[in-house]
């Protein structure tokens, strides 16, 4: 997967108003990367990756072109890899998403030496930062 990495190809804005604007103007994208904080509350909406990551994925899914890609990242420490996989598999049941690949965090990127066991088991991922590449199909 190769996407040109020029600044004009990336949008970093407040999630909820931006998604609403794109939906109302019928803007579609080949690839969406969703990497929210694990928890945030603003007057515009709430992000809670521990309890409701599926809702955020479902908000961006309609913005992705048929055959496009969604890179979904969940870095909530208290969400195990298995729990996140169950969420993703549940989202894939209707056939509009499918899991293409899980991306493991490289050892040299983690930035610390693990001491003891993680808070939750990250398997099938190798780190609490859980990254999945999903293929998107539209009606």
Can you name each region flagged by the protein language model?
Residues 23-24, 44-47, 84-85:
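Short amphipathic alpha-helical segments
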Residues 14-16, 38, 76:
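Active-site-proximal loop/turn and secondary-structure-junction residues that shape catalytic pockets
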Residues 19-20, 40-43, 81:
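Short acidic/glycine-rich loop or secondary-structure boundary segments that cap or lie
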Residues 23, 57-61, 89:
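A structural alpha-helix within SAM-dependent methyltransferase catalytic domains
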Residues 1-33:
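S-adenosyl-L-methionine
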Residues 64-66:
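Helix-to-beta-strand junctions that scaffold the AdoMet/dcAdoMet cofactor pocket
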